Curated annotation (Swiss-Prot):
The gene is SBTM1. One of its GO terms (cellular component) is apoplast. This is Subtilisin-like protease 1. Gene3D superfamilies: 2.60.40.2310, 3.50.30.30, Peptidase S8 propeptide/proteinase inhibitor I9, Peptidase S8/S53 domain. PROSITE patterns: SUBTILASE, SUBTILASE_ASP.
Amino acid sequence: MEQTKYRMELVLLLGLISMLSFIPASIAAEEGQEHDNLTTYIVHVKKLEIEGPLQSTEELHTWHHSFLPETSNKDRMVFSYRNVASGFAVRLTPEEANALQEKEEVMSIRPERTLSLHTTHTPSFLGLRQGQGLWNDSNLGKGVIIGVIDTGIYPFHLSFNDEGMPPPPAKWKGHCEFTGGSVCNNKLIGARNLVKSAIQEPPYEDFFHGTHTAAEAAGRFVEGASVFGNARGTAAGMAPDAHLAIYKVCSSKVKDECPESAILAAMDIAIEDGVDVLSLSLGLGSLPFFEDPIAIGAFAATQKGIFVSCSAANSGPHYSSLSNEAPWILTVGASTIDRKISASAKLGNGAEYEGETLFQPKDFSSQLLPLVYAAAEKNNSSALCAPGSLRNINVKGKVVVCDLGGGIPFIAKGQEVLDAGGSAMILANIENFGFTTLANAHVLPAVHVSYAASLAIKAYINSTYTPTATVLFQGTIIGDSLAPSVAAFSSRGPSQQSPGILKPDIIGPGVNILAAWAVSVDNKIPAFDIISGTSMSCPHLSGIAALLKSAHPDWSPAAIKSAIMTTANTLNLRGLPILDQRLQPADIFATGAGHVNPVRANDPGLVYDIQPEDYVPYLCGLGYSDREVTIIVQRSVRCFNVKSIAQAELNYPSFSILLGSDSQFYTRTLTNVGPANSTYTVKIDVPLAMGISVSPSQITFTQVNQKVAYFVDFIPQIKENRGNHTFAQGAITWVSDKHVVRTPISVIFK
């Protein structure tokens, strides 16, 4: 009964989503008119100086309530944080917030912000095969708990069945907030809703995002998965036998859809519950780490040995457009896979331009139809096929060219064409999107084509009085040799907050990804859909991290990150450098270390390890104040007493050098996780306009877990050698008879 009721609610919500209208619930409805000016604030306070930890949650709440105005009531407290921060979220008036700021114990107080979501075949594409390699060594992730912080989940999907799965590990402390005892199981072991609203509800999906990301990370094997008959095969996440814990932090039913206070609360509870991996496909943009809730929460998680994977954001191809930049986070960009859901635009002059679409109706005629680009007849709004823009334009029975952009969802553009009587749509890329095309479940026959194709199609329209076109459908095609390539939307580095740390760290599958969906888009059950974004690449890496954690339970979060980065692929299936959306070699700020190779990451040979305490000198070196560092690390820090280090001195599995006229000298320490007796020789790919000296040029290990340091001198050359280049890239690679350990280098010229 509960499942049927939820399906009905989701169908109604899907209709609302298609109209792009949400009706938010009022968080403060029950508090009365006198509290209309209350705002949620995030408050960081000094740790209570007592011997040992607080004895109970009640003691913590009592202490936090002591900061509140005497006239306020307990309903003002939104969350008390125990693990991720020394502080709480509370609803105050601006005057009360100003008064609280004056208290000596208060280190920081500011209004909370709203975070944004970063919205079958991939296991095979990544080399994961049943009974072999990493899937075999890790038992498909068995015993590892992945915490997914997202929009909730549709728990009844077959991707979350628990057939043959053991109970969760004894360390698991979480619980399930779904009503009915059979909703959670040995696969979906916990689910919480952290979004505070007038009516508290179970953590059901209402954004059509969290179900997909959870299934990508750890969905079970489901045969016969497809959407509109395309991408048919067996669906599976990266770690099919890992346990899932779901933390809902976003809801369409509240004003601030992904509130910061809920995200901190989810990370706080996940740490307490005992997760091994945290996956967050959301972000706030670039913020100082002491103001970034994910950076603060992730540091606390890292201290507990929890691996944190986050999406890089979808603001590419612009430089310095990243979210989630902290070095203790794995920052994941998006790449294509070798599967295309292919279609083409055929013009009256005989030319055909390849593209993609998910909706491929078999009854659509290949007969040529009149072709129109509405911008030539009206204005920019009609060129974008904005809602209502085609109302007074004759598009009935025609193929309509719609430009990408304008903040208008792809599906909404097609809906406008359909409502105006159009027969088909050609979705035309703008320059920034280049050759990146997406397969969407359009509402009418459509094809998404590249920027080069869009220019050619518009030139054809202008060349004749009677332009015609149609859309041809080719279905699923596997074997695109240009994969992986970097998606146009994938956010790029360098990091704004810490340019001395290379970001993103890695790229992974994030374009046209099939996974579980809450409501069927093609009237088939179980439901699947194909969507794109760094939101999709993040859970791929979260699942891969879970596999590595299962195969190597003694590895630290930093060691797992190092294994992923130093074994990454830098070539596509054709054996050429990975390309970007222009079909040009992608630079290091697009790819980071490269494209994830989970099979090689399982046996990296060497790793760069970092302990949580090592980040303190780095944070002081960023110029943060004692108070700001204390907010992040949750203990009193005086940078005067800490030997600060430059950003590039952190023992990171990459180098990011800000190079002026002086040489720079850095040390790295490698830990042997390969054969006890092994020798590595250095190979240097020297970046443009500089020299590199590495000493020693050969390193030998005689024990497992032995550590050996090496030293690197970065030597600038004359500025004229740089030409117009503002940065350069290269690599230091350690090679043995069994392993290749690549450390990428970015150089930003000052």
